[in-house]
């Protein structure tokens, strides 16, 4: 397998089935979505994690990629619940479905938490990015995210997001 860093390429040499490492980014689909997934794939590959965990993550990401290309998903930040529910069709086993669903959530989290600016129009907000004061978080049952994926009508979702920003005390 090729990677610009030879040490990383060597890590995967002869240890993983090659089909798990081959990604065809020439497929028709959103360039933004492809770039988002490529950034996440690179992050996974560069992490110092066990090869088994890395392989599981790549397997899930591959199903997410195939799903996004076939469903013409433009941007992972705006996936709705109806779209996410379709993901199960793209996995051939219950295990692959579970991996893909987990990776879709991880993609959303990565994109929200690593963006230069907070992406207030995303369909999922992760509160770790908002750095709320300790007194505003219930330590026995902390809320980790707000999901707006179930709100299909864009205008309604935007109104609720503005209201949630108000509730959180965010004015920018």
Regions found by a protein language model. Name each.
Residues 1-172:
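Charge-rich, intrinsically disordered N-terminal extensions
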């Amino acid at each position: 397998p090729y990677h610009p860093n030879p040490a990383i390429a060597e890590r995967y040499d002869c240890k993983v089935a090659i089909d798990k490492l081959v990604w065809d980014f020439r497929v028709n689909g959103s360039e933004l979505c492809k770039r988002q997934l490529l950034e996440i794939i690179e992050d996974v590959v560069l992490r110092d994690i066990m090869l088994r965990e890395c392989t599981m993550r790549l397997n899930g990401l591959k199903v997410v990629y195939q799903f996004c290309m076939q469903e013409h998903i433009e941007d992972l930040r705006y996936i709705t619940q109806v779209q996410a529910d379709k993901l199960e069709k793209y996995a051939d086993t219950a295990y692959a479905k579970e991996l893909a669903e987990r990776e879709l959530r991880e993609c959303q989290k990565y994109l929200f938490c690593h963006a230069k600016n907070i992406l207030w129009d995303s369909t999922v907000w992760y509160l770790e990015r908002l750095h709320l004061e300790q007194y505003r978080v219930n330590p026995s049952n902390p809320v980790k995210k707000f999901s707006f994926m179930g709100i299909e009508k864009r205008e309604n979702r935007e109104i609720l997001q503005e209201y949630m920003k108000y509730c959180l005390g965010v004015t920018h």
